[in-house]
């Protein structure tokens, strides 16, 4: 469940900023998703992904890249992670690791050795990895899925086209265990594709219908 709070935080974050506190579903039978949240992340890509996955009864852990302190995103929305990435990786395996985009957030993901370790571990187990907008370049930086079909925000294409089979004409691309998408406006389909892979097409369609969204698996 996501709830919007109004609260003051240090470092210039005021009551005027929206704060989203993430509370994990406690259903132990659910599939598990890890969303890594870095400062400067694209908040639509984060929020829609977390919300849609939870609507699909997927257990979502939101891990702050550096710690579990509030994270200011690209448009000054402030998100309170469930935990830190360091702590999240001690909690067991995840069925999917999700990377939201955002230029500053993606730069932090690219420069984090911890993110690289998580992604390589996930890839070695054949687990799903999902990246949207700028975040596929973090996959490239950490050596994930080289040669596979992917997409991204169009501005990222020059950094990716020599390493991957780049797809221009699809909003969401899946190649094996790698799911990629293009930007804020494609996040619903991105999150529904993850939902489909974890809990089935029928659940994904039911979630989409409840949101008045049309999803075609």
Swiss-Prot record:
Q: Which Pfam families match?
A: DJ-1_PfpI
Localization recorded for this chain is: Cytoplasm; Nucleus; Mitochondrion
InterPro entries associated with the record: Class_I_gatase-like, DJ-1, DJ-1/PfpI, Prot/Nucl_acid_deglycase
Protein name per its UniProtKB record = Protein DJ-1alpha
Q: In which tissues is it expressed?
A: Expressed in testis (at protein level).
Q: Source taxonomy lineage?
A: Eukaryota, Metazoa, Ecdysozoa, Arthropoda, Hexapoda
Gene3D superfamilies (alphabetical): 3.40.50.880
Molecular function terms, GO-annotated:
peroxiredoxin activity; protein deglycase activity
């Amino acid at each position: 469940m996501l709830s919007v709070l109004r609260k003051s935080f240090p470092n210039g974050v005021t009551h005027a900023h929206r704060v989203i506190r993430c509370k994990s579903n406690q259903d132990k039978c659910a599939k598990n998703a890890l969303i890594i949240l870095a400062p400067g992340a694209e908040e639509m890509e984060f929020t829609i992904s977390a919300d849609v996955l939870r609507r699909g009864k997927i257990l979502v852990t939101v891990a702050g890249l550096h710690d579990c302190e509030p994270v200011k995103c690209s448009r000054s929305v402030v998100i309170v992670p469930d935990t830190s990435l360091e702590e999240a990786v001690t909690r067991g395996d995840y069925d999917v690791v999700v990377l939201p985009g955002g230029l500053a957030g993606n730069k932090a993901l690219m420069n984090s050795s911890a993110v690289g370790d998580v992604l390589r571990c996930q890839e070695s187990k054949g687990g799903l990895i999902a990246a949207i907008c700028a975040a596929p370049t973090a996959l490239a930086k950490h050596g994930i899925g080289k040669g596979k079909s992917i997409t991204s925000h169009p501005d990222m294409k020059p950094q990716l086209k020599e390493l991957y089979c780049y797809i221009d004409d699809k909003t969401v691309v899946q190649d094996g265990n790698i799911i990629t998408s293009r930007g804020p406006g494609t996040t619903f389909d991105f999150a529904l594709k993850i939902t489909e892979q974890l809990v089935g097409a029928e659940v994904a369609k039911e979630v989409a219908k409840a949101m008045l969204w049309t999803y075609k698996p």
